[in-house]
Amino acid sequence: EHKKEKRNGAFGTMLAGAGTEDRFQGRASINKFQKQQQSSFLGMGNNVNEQGFSLSDYMNFSGGSQQMMGGGGGTMRIQIDGAQSGVPLNFGGRQNGIMTNYAGGLNFNKDFSPKTQLNTSYFYSYLDQNLLRSIDRINYLPSGSYNFAQNSKQLSNAHNHRANLTLDQKLDSANSFKLTASASYNESNQAYQTSSTTALPDGTLQNEGINTTTNNSSGINFNTNMLLRHRFAKKGRTVSANLTFGINHAESCGTLQSTNQYYTTPGETLDIAQTNSQVNDNQTYGANVSYTEPLGNRKYLEASYNIRT
């Protein structure tokens, strides 16, 4: 078992590199432990198509490694939820296009007393992706063949902010509450353009077209949860109330511009121009009350009531 005084200190890692064609990569993590307190920084940036952090980086940042060093008997459960914390995780896999991404955040955990525990975190991530595709294809039909060529370009970027807070407070030996709150803001922009031609083997154009679509969206989310707990004098008899509240706002707008020229019918051109926009606002309220009564011989009776709007 590690003694508490041996868990005081700091450690971290740093990595930096540069290459041809303005390629770069950087990563840093700093973790500091004190009595009943942990603070962490995690950051990265690169344009070599590497997204997210490793599992060990995430555990050090969130405090999982400190829990593992705590020693003692019993069992321990570690939940990996990068989406909930806002930390992007890297589980491998191939990424298409040229991507530039930055991510970084702060985490602070502190036990103010045996009755008061606080966990907070903030994380930001940015991703920029450029994707170019070209297709050259010959199609063979019973009536003959034709050549199809297409070039496409996709540009997209996304910003994400997320903050989390958890306060666990024991009021006395029988009563406690746990407050959990999270807020996030995200914004994304996309532009996609394709140009294509269809021609006979001798180069005679049959049709050609160009299509451009754009989409811009943003969203704000806020969720809070208050868990109230009471333990009666009789062992195993408890009552709890869980109150939830959430706000969600999302909006998006997009455009479509398309022009297609058909040469098999001289002078026939098809033009399309469209715009669309959406706004969604939601509020949610919820409450759950649960009562547990011991029946003896490790058996319990639980009654609960739940409401959600």
Locate the predicted segments by residue.
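Membrane-proximal, glycine/serine-rich, low-complexity loop/turn segments characteristic
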Residues: 1-193, 211-253, 285, 290-308
